[in-house]
A protein has these predicted regions:
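AMP-forming adenylation/ATP pyrophosphatase catalytic core
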Residues: 115-123, 127-217
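ATP-dependent adenylation/nucleotidyltransferase module used to activate substrates
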Residues: 1-146, 157, 166-167, 173
Length: 217
């Protein structure tokens, strides 16, 4: 019997190509989009992911994790900036959400593993799993995956580890995916315009006073 894999699908080309590769290798797969915050792009992501799954004739579902995402990612992000730190919310999201809550959901629902469209590799060395760099070093994402535990690594597949981004796009285009030419996301997903100060101000409902520039000389 084929292994059951739950594929995290953002609606973008990478996760779609990952699902396509797994299906071509005979895995029993299902697509899942995580709804992490309430904005106008989330329904579009769900739509694109579902269209890809329909194209591949695989089941699809979405999972609302807004409360957990706010607790584990957005709130620490705001707190860090207020304390003069520079957070990386993608690392916290991978640790707690994609490879935390989604993996828990997968295992509780009869799946053997999860898969994502990250560019990295997981290799077995002795009795341990090791995270190694992707073939496409310009897209390598090992940095944002570094906190993953042995349990998480053991139950994760990263199908794009040996592909370049161009190869992933080509596979998606060859199968007629609607998102084959979709632009890459560059900014933090919940602050797409990159204006962190305004986001924090609006979220907290407060205005911040300007600080002083100090010359040590």
């Amino acid at each position: 019997m084929a292994e059951k894999i739950l594929v995290g699908m953002s609606g973008g080309v990478d996760s779609s190509a990952a699902a396509l590769l797994l299906k071509s290798k005979g895995y029993d797969i299902k697509g899942l989009t995580l709804c992490l915050y309430n904005d106008e792009k989330t329904p579009l992501s769900v739509r694109d992911a579902k269209q890809v799954c329909d194209k591949m004739q695989i089941p699809f579902d979405s999972l609302n994790l807004e409360n957990l995402f706010n607790e584990k990612v957005i709130t620490p992000f705001i707190n860090d900036y207020q304390n003069g730190l520079t957070p990386n919310p993608c690392i916290e999201c991978n640790k707690h959400i994609k490879f935390g809550a989604m993996l828990d959901y997968a295992l509780k629902n009869g799946f053997n593993k999860i898969a994502t469209g990250h560019y990295a590799n997981i290799k077995k060395q002795g009795d341990r799993f090791v995270l190694t760099r992707a073939k496409d070093l310009s897209k390598d994402q090992t940095y944002v995956l570094y906190p993953l535990t042995q349990h998480q690594l053991a139950h994760t597949l990263l199908p794009l580890g040996e592909l370049t981004k161009d190869e992933a796009r080509q596979k998606a285009a060859q199968d007629g995916f609607v998102n084959a030419n979709k632009a890459d996301s560059q900014d933090i997903c919940f602050v797409p315009d990159g204006d962190y100060a305004t986001f924090i101000s609006k979220t907290l409902g407060t205005e911040f006073s300007q600080g002083d520039f100090l010359d040590l000389d």
